[in-house]
Amino acid sequence: MAEVGSKSVLFVCLGNICRSPIAEAVFRKLVTDEKVSDNWRIDSAATSTYEVGNPPDYRGQNCMRKHGIHMQHIARQITKEDFATFDYILCMDESNLRDLNRKSNQVKNCKAKIELLGSYDPQKQLIIEDPYYGNDSDFEVVYQQCLRCCKAFLEKTY
């Protein structure tokens, strides 16, 4: 569920059960730790309808639990309203970016800046690979990438 705030970010991946809910949970923890959570509206969504209504992948939940981060999300697809109401839409790979740019062209009042979350990575790992067909270590890689990128994004935007 999105929170009220003066800045807003929507994290997006293909199904909204692996990468984007991890990024959402990581960013929520960062803004909470920095005591700026009241200033942010944060959510995540999918470009597809494949997983709508499902909770995050259990491997991602296990990974986040290991790092002391609570994950509470139900997958949803991005809407036209999201493009008009979020300041930033941060996605995980080139396919997401193409889909989002195509969808944004169908929205008259798109205000969102659409970018790859990996563009904020100090280690220059531009793409956050989908761990769905991988193992627990792939989810750890996604967590570490999201942590680096979300920290850098928060520093740049706050």
Curated annotation (Swiss-Prot):
InterPro entries: LMW_PTPase, Ptyr_pPase, Ptyr_pPase_sf, Tyr_Pase_low_mol_wt_mml, Tyr_phospatase_low_mol_wt. Its EC number is 3.1.3.48, 3.1.3.2. It holds the Pfam family LMWPc. Inhibited by sulfhydryl reagents. Disulfide bonds: none annotated. Belongs to the low molecular weight phosphotyrosine protein phosphatase family. It is an enzyme of class 3 (hydrolase). SMART domains: LMWPc. Widely expressed with highest levels in brain and liver and lowest levels in muscle. This is Low molecular weight phosphotyrosine protein phosphatase. It comes from Mus musculus.
